Amino acid sequence: MTWFESIILGLVQGLTEFLPISSSAHLRLTAVAAGWRDPGAAFTAVTQIGTETAVLVYFRKDIVRIVTAWTRSLVHKEARGNIDAKMGWLVIIGSVPIGVLGLTLKDYIEGPFRDLRLIACTLIGLAVLLALADRFAARNAERAESVGRHRADRPVKELDDLTVRDGLIYGFCQALALIPGVSRSGATITGGLFLRYSRAAAARYSFLLAIPAVLASGAYELTEIGEPGSHVDWGPTILATLVAGVVGYAVIAWFMRFITTRSFMPFVIYRIALGSTVLALVWFGVLDPFAGGVHE
């Protein structure tokens, strides 16, 4: 990998990680479009450490509060009812599905799942679900304005309404992102909207939930890369990770403002257009579905 490639791929990772359009799909497609070798699942996992560092910085106050409350809940029973302590436990619970499935499906993630036809189909499929969830959320918001904000009857939920059941559902939605094209934020936000959480609450928990999974995945890939016989261009990879982190922070700040007043339809349209284009190019033989594959 050249330094130029690493900068471009870092920009792509940072721009797409937190938007519901799939960073892994865009890294794969960028490499194909430029005629580069597929950077692979390991590169994606390591560069995601950069974007998750952006999450740690952006949500630092929330994270410090949650970690502090969760730690206290381990020692003091009375602290277990604290909302932040509860959030800590729910982030852990929601991280279990992707941890188990990530290890179980590792060979598929690094191989068959990177087929451009599958990526195109998941781009389109999740777009349809996101559109339905967005419309569902809009109707719930309208109902919320008419019935008031009393907990007993409010149709829109916030983070303090999270339950173990909801946390697990979020977790399984996150696990779908093991397939390039799904999008971690897209899947979890879609799940959250269907569970009747507000757009802001769905996005915030989505970003917090990703922290353990992404950092663990990146650390695991770092140990794998360090095995004898493995090869990695450390300089370009580190540069891509730094670029992804800086750009990712700016994207989080923009996205959290965007979703408070706008719908997800621009992302839905983009996903369908991109997925349809990739399918057409593969269908007409312009693109090889395994072009630039890591196993070539």
List the predicted regions and their residue ranges.
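Multi-pass membrane proteins that catalyze or facilitate reactions on polyprenyl-/lipid-phosphate substrates
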Residues: 1-296
